[in-house]
Amino acid sequence: MDSRLARLTTLQTSAGEELRRTSIIGTIGPKTNNPETLVALRKAGLNIVRMNFSHGSYEYHKSVIDNARKSEELYPGRPLAIALDTKGPEIRTGTTTNEVDYPIPPNHEMIFTTDDKYAKACDDKIMYLDYKNITKVISAGRIIYVDDGVLSFEVLQVVDDKTLKVKSLNAGKICSHKGVNLPGTDVDLPALSEKDKADLRFGVENGVHMIFASFIRTAQDVLTIREVLGEDGKDIKIVVKIENQQGVNNFDEILKVTDAVMVARGDLGIEIPAPEVLAVQKKLIAKSNLAGKPVICATQMLESMTYNPRPTRAEVSDVGNAVLDGADCVMLSGETAKGNYPINAVTTMAETALIAEQAIAYLPNYDDIRNCTPKPTSTTETVAASAVAAVFEQKAKAIIVLSTSGTTARLVSKYRPNCPIILVTRNARTARFSHLYRGVFPFVYEKESVSDWTEDVEARLNFGIEQAIEFGILKKGDTYVSIQGFKAGVGHSNTLQVSTA
């Protein structure tokens, strides 16, 4: 039974003994920022710690990093990755007089201004916006959302270079420092604010493994971030967050220069009509899969578990369908940052992802990816694809990859084998950021290399087999496929072997 439909007719409805291959990202907040809770989250399935730099001081974020590392001392397990999520360039309202929240009735006409004299003197008649060019990029008839769409305004008139006349489309309250969205409008905000640049430098100094870059609109935005990261941050992975129509429109060019992608559905669902988010999610994930770039699905995945011990059935389906779409990782935000049930949320996400993975028709999926990948491929990718083909033909239980940079493991993951990928590397950073790749189980080999290359390969391979057996991935006598290089260094993975444990 190779067809997708035939596979679904035999689908097991329980998790069974399979190992989850989708990685879980959890945002760390005050309720989870301690080593003991981080250990519990890791045991439940957490792979990547996310720090949200829209909130918190450097002192606080440093404590998250320290506690994440302390959790590894308490519970070694698999290595934990740390991600820095930038605040990004945003448009916000000014400060209301005495910080009052002003009620706004429907059809209420008022002024939006960029005049600095109103920055701290806003009310229900005049509201300051901190985007100086708004009058240049917007026109009458356009919609402006305030506070994640809680309030909607129609632009009636561009009065002058600092002033818009607007009309409310619904009732609500207008407040200080709320986010502003301009759906359907191309904005010219810089890729990085001064705060973002300082935050990136903090990330480099403190050894984060990846950057979640907010509000990416163009490929140049990614190059700007890479420039700020500099030589010391050259091995930090950049994950672009696609959150607006510009990012969607320019996605093909962005994909060429980024390391990974996040479909950030929160702001995206405000910037474009919410029903279109479904199609955009599937499209961006498919393009990322074909490019061999890892992709994260994020925002409101188990939102109700912030305050409830059980998710809604729709949320469970959302997580499962993201896995079926091809997401390498799924992410929790408030559920683990401020929620009452963070460990429950990770456990629920892990169990849901595991069952969803069993619904994937792996062989047809492999054929799709292989047929749609432009030829010729690199030697490393050819070997990676062949290793996955060997898994199907040999019914192998694992692929063991000996790698320095992690590129081979990423390319094996691209072809979505129906078994775990054991990555053995001496590079601890490679092990950590490889959590971005679906199915990759990283292990750090700490022994020094020996001069005899064959002996060194055999030692690392045996280590990989030992780890796979310890984690229940392999049993004695199981078939596995291995990939290694013919000599030391990066980019030489060209040897494939089928063996038994």
Swiss-Prot record:
PANTHER family (UniProt xref): PYRUVATE KINASE (PTHR11817)
Query: One GO molecular-function annotation for this sequence?
Result: pyruvate kinase activity
Quaternary arrangement and interactors, per the entry?
Homotetramer.
Q: Which Pfam families match?
A: PK (PF00224), PK_C (PF02887)
Kindly indicate whether the keyword Transferase belongs to this entry. Answer: yes
Where does this protein hold Mg(2+)? 243, 267
- Chemical reaction(s) catalysed: pyruvate + ATP = phosphoenolpyruvate + ADP + H(+)
Pathway in which the depicted protein is active: Carbohydrate degradation; glycolysis; pyruvate from D-glyceraldehyde 3-phosphate: step 5/5
Class of the enzyme per the UniProt entry, highest EC level: transferase
Record-annotated residues binding K(+)? 52, 54, 85-86
User: Which SUPFAM superfamilies does the record cross-reference, listed alphabetically?
Assistant: Phosphoenolpyruvate/pyruvate domain, PK beta-barrel domain-like, PK C-terminal domain-like
The residues that the entry says bind substrate are 50, 266-267, 299
To which species is this protein native?
Answer: Candida glabrata (strain ATCC 2001 / BCRC 20586 / JCM 3761 / NBRC 0622 / NRRL Y-65 / CBS 138) (Yeast)
Q: Where is this site: Transition state stabilizer?
A: 241
Q: Which cofactor does it need?
A: Mg(2+); K(+)
Query: Where does the chain bind ATP?
Result: 52-55, 92, 178
Q: Which domain of life is it from?
A: Eukaryota
Query: According to its UniProt record, which protein family does this protein belong to?
Result: Belongs to the pyruvate kinase family.
Q: Does the keyword Transport apply?
A: no
Q: Which InterPro entries match?
A: Pyr_Knase (IPR001697), Pyrv/PenolPyrv_kinase-like_dom (IPR015813), Pyrv_kinase-like_dom_sf (IPR040442), Pyrv_Knase-like_insert_dom_sf (IPR011037), Pyrv_Knase_AS (IPR018209), Pyrv_Knase_brl (IPR015793), Pyrv_Knase_C (IPR015795), Pyrv_Knase_C_sf (IPR036918)
Known EC number(s)? Answer: 2.7.1.40
For this entry, the protein name equals Pyruvate kinase 1
Keywords in alphabetical order: ATP-binding, Glycolysis, Kinase, Magnesium, Metal-binding, Nucleotide-binding, Potassium, Pyruvate, Transferase
